[in-house]
Structure formats: structure tokens, C-alpha cells
Regions:
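RNA-interacting cores
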Residues: 1-213
Length: 213
């Protein structure tokens, strides 16, 4: 697998438009590959005052088009992902960042037997609880106080120019501890939660930190 980073130019009109419509970035990401369509994870990230698009993919991407459309002219960076995955061991602690779409099933009081419809978690307490629940499913542990919500954004756009879509994007940062390396590696590669086509679900990790509790 490959993890790529492309610096974006937020002053360009094309980038401004894409920042309000993730469908634009999704299309550019898909056009970076030839052949069969596969799941790719991507995310917008800010670091030291610069804006980047991170991309995790099975195949080596051709980022020429994406750079031409949204970039600053700086060459993109790409590296193999396997060396990081190999460092994931049971009990290891990592700093993490995740932008995800936390949702919860809400039952209809008029039909209590029906499966509840998935609705966004707008309350911060619910957003934190969602991540705590996801941790148990994906091979890592969190404790309250070891992570926080650092950003929230609601994005409205039309899918394929037709159906209206509303996505809640919540960014989490903190320290986690790996409890099941295999499940954790799978989550890193496959993503977490909904909205993956629109820049959600990619967790990035940096070795460091220590367990809380």
C-alpha cells in the first residue's frame, strides 16, 4: 500500500470550490488510478499553515492531474505503508488523527420494532462515545481524557449534481493503545465509519505517547 501527500493551493478557485464539495476531490482521487475501481481513503489535513490531501491506496497513484487541478506546484510525496503497519504491535501506543462521520441509529417512536435510521451525532458527548465504541470493534483502546474533538464541519453538496448530501465531519486527536494488531491494521487500511468516498474515515498514526489509565 501507499500513503501519498499532495500540497493544495487554497487560493486557487478550483480548490475553493472543491473545499465546499468533496465530490470534486473524490473525482480527482479516482482519476489518479487506472483500471478497476477500488476503495481508496483520503483526507484533507492542515500542517504548519499548509493544506494537504492525504491518500491511502493499494496501487501507486499518478497524482499529476490532482496536482495540476488543485496543487501549489510542489511535488507530491509518496511512501510505502507496510513499514508502518509492521510496527503495530499489541500494547503499542500511538498519537492519532481521524476525521470521521459519527452516526447513531435513532428509532422512530411510532414504530419501535423497526430498525432505527442512522443520524449524525451532533452533540460532542455523542461524538466521543461513538469513537469509544468504534475502538472496541477495531482493535484499539481509548480512555476519556486521552483524546478530544478538535474540529467539526457540516458539508452540504449534491451527489452527481442531483441528490443533496449532508455530511458531518468530526476530527479527533489523541493517544490510543493497540489491543488487537490484526484488527487495527485492517481498520487503518479499510477506514472507519461512513463517508469514505468524501474524505472521511482515514486514521493516521504517529508512534509515541503513553497509555492513560
Amino acid at each position: 500500500m501507499y500513503l501519498s501527500r499532495t500540497e493544495l493551493d487554497p487560493a486557487r478557485r478550483s480548490t475553493m470550490i472543491a473545499l465546499t464539495s468533496p465530490q470534486k476531490f473524490h473525482g480527482a482521487v479516482e482519476n489518479s488510478f487506472s483500471g478497476e475501481r477500488r476503495r481508496r481513503l483520503w483526507r484533507l489535513d492542515s500542517l504548519n499553515g499548509k493544506l494537504y490531501l492525504l491518500l491511502l491506496s493499494e496501487e501507486l497513484p499518478d497524482l499529476t492531474g490532482l496536482c495540476a487541478q488543485f496543487g501549489t506546484g510542489a511535488a507530491p510525496e509518496t511512501r510505502r505503508y507496510e513499514p508502518l503497519l509492521e510496527r503495530v504491535t499489541s500494547g503499542s501506543c500511538w498519537q492519532f488523527r481521524l476525521t470521521a462521520n459519527p452516526t447513531r441509529a435513532r428509532k422512530d417512536p411510532a414504530d419501535p420494532l423497526a430498525r432505527g435510521a442512522l443520524k449524525p451525532c451532533y452533540l460532542e458527548a455523542e461524538q466521543e462515545q461513538w469513537l469509544l465504541e468504534q475502538a472496541g470493534k477495531h482493535g484499539f483502546a481509548l480512555t476519556e481524557g486521552a483524546f478530544q474533538v478538535t474540529r467539526k464541519q457540516t458539508c452540504h453538496f449534491r451527489k452527481n449534481g442531483k441528490r443533496p448530501v449532508t455530511l458531518l465531519a468530526v476530527t479527533y486527536e489523541g493517544i490510543l493503545q493497540v489491543t488487537d494488531p490484526e484488527a487495527f491494521r485492517e481498520m487503518l487500511c479499510q477506514g472507519i465509519g461512513r463517508g469514505k468516498a468524501y474524505g472521511l474515515g482515514l486514521m493516521t498514526i504517529l508512534h509515541g505517547g503513553r497509555s492513560h489509565g
